[in-house]
């Protein structure tokens, strides 16, 4: 299958680890010149070395906090300086808050929207004019399964779910609006992906809730025994990266405005 990605350029947010890192690696293998953005410079440096080691491709990096509007404003200049043009945008940065509805703080609610939906909206708004000016482009917004289904404890998502749903709806609206400009927009919705960062995040959430040692141990047993996932297995970042690469390739030229769910049939609806 010819993907037609050689010599294209791409920006991947949240690209220093997990799905973002593997997406940057997979794009680099296809001959794409990749710019990876994430918050921590040390993590970006590690990602660049890792991708160079496995692909012999040099990637560009730039620190970026997608919750800071003033930093998002600099993206067009960064792209021009480091890539020259922008063919592909992968909006991967995001996170989740998993706690009971009545325990979610207003700060967590605002942060959840800012790092997920607001960031994707704002970044697209800065990059789309560049794509229109150059004649087209491809965008993938990465959402999550809490945007399409309600999960079992401990994966409580009253805060994260609405933000992820907004990303999905935004992708569909944008696909329709930008189709006349030769810009395709799709939304990739991963299921449970097994990364060290996911479990570290849940540990931080547990610490915030100040559970008893017994209750904390009970919640950890749900993670490790897969009871929260029921009859399906955990996916890998590489599997989601492969889907993203396909979605931005010439092989997916008729796929636009799609919800691309990769969850091993976890969602039975």
Question: Language-model features: where?
Answer:
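Canonical Rossmann dinucleotide-binding motif of NAD(H)/NADP(H)-dependent dehydrogenases/reductases
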Residues: 3-35
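Substrate-binding pocket helix/loop in short-chain dehydrogenase/reductase
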Residues: 100-101, 108-113, 225
């Amino acid at each position: 299958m010819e993907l037609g990605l050689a010599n294209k350029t791409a920006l991947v947010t949240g690209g220093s680890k997990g799905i973002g890192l593997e997406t940057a690696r997979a794009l680099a293998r296809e001959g794409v010149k990749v710019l990876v953005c994430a918050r921590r410079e040390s993590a970006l440096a590690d990602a660049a070395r890792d991708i160079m080691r496995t692909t012999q491709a040099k990637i560009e990096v730039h620190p970026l906090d997608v919750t800071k509007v003033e930093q998002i404003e600099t993206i067009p200049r960064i792209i021009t300086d480091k890539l020259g043009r922008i063919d592909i945008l992968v909006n991967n940065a995001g996170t989740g808050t998993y706690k009971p509805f009545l325990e979610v703080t207003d700060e967590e609610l605002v942060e959840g929207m800012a790092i997920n939906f607001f960031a994707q909206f704002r970044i697209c708004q800065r990059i789309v004019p560049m794509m229109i000016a150059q004649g087209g482009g491809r965008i993938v917004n990465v959402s999550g399964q809490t945007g399409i289904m309600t999960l079992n404890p401990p994966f409580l998502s009253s805060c994260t779910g609405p933000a992820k749903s907004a990303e999905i709806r935004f992708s569909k609206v944008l696909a329709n609006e930008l189709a006349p400009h030769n810009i395709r927009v799709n939304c990739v919705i991963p299921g449970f992906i097994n990364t060290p960062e996911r479990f570290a995040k849940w540990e931080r959430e547990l610490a915030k809730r100040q559970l008893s040692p017994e209750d904390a141990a009970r919640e950890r047993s749900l993670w490790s025994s897969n009871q929260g996932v029921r009859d399906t297995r955990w996916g890998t970042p590489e599997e989601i990266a492969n889907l993203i690469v396909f979605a931005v390739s010439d092989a997916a030229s008729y796929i636009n405005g799609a919800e691309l769910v990769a969850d091993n049939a976890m969602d039975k609806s």
